From Swiss-Prot:
Keywords: Ribonucleoprotein, Ribosomal protein, RNA-binding, rRNA-binding. One of its GO terms (cellular component) is ribosome. It comes from the Bacteria. Part of the 50S ribosomal subunit. Contacts protein L29, and trigger factor when it is bound to the ribosome. One of the early assembly proteins it binds 23S rRNA. One of the proteins that surrounds the polypeptide exit tunnel on the outside of the ribosome. Forms the main docking site for trigger factor binding to the ribosome. One of its GO terms (biological process) is translation. Belongs to the universal ribosomal protein uL23 family. Gene3D superfamilies: 3.30.70.330. It comes from Bacillus cytotoxicus (strain DSM 22905 / CIP 110041 / 391-98 / NVH 391-98). One of its GO terms (molecular function) is rRNA binding. This is Large ribosomal subunit protein uL23. InterPro entries: Nucleotide-bd_a/b_plait_sf, Ribosomal_uL23-like, Ribosomal_uL23/eL15/eS24_sf, Ribosomal_uL23_CS. Pfam families: Ribosomal_L23. The keyword Oxidoreductase does not apply.
């Protein structure tokens, strides 16, 4: 099994993700090879909360150019984690 800190990369702080916190939904960038079960176990291990549901979205790389040089951005995977009703809040999102 992989280390939970290798699965969860960083929290996603956007206007929409802050609104979803009222529904106990938290958004994270996760490893592109992680599945829902691994994300659930990682969030529970790192933050000590109970996870009810995990939704995962894949983002394709975008084509970018700088002068004559063309390339692509990295592909991403984003997870929206819904906590149970009796679970505590995640502290890293407080005060943002």
């Amino acid at each position: 099994m992989r280390d939970p800190r290798d699965i969860i990369k960083r929290p996603v702080i956007t206007e929409r993700s802050m609104e979803m916190m009222a529904e106990k939904k938290y958004t994270f960038d996760v490893d592109v090879k992680a599945n829902k079960t691994e994300v659930k176990d990682a969030v529970e291990a790192i933050f000590g909360v109970e996870v009810e549901k995990v939704n995962i979205m894949n983002y394709k790389p975008k084509a970018k150019r700088v002068g004559r040089h063309a390339g692509f951005t990295n592909r991403r995977r984003k997870a929206i984690v819904k906590l149970t009703a009796d679970s505590k809040e995640i502290e890293i999102f407080q005060g943002v």
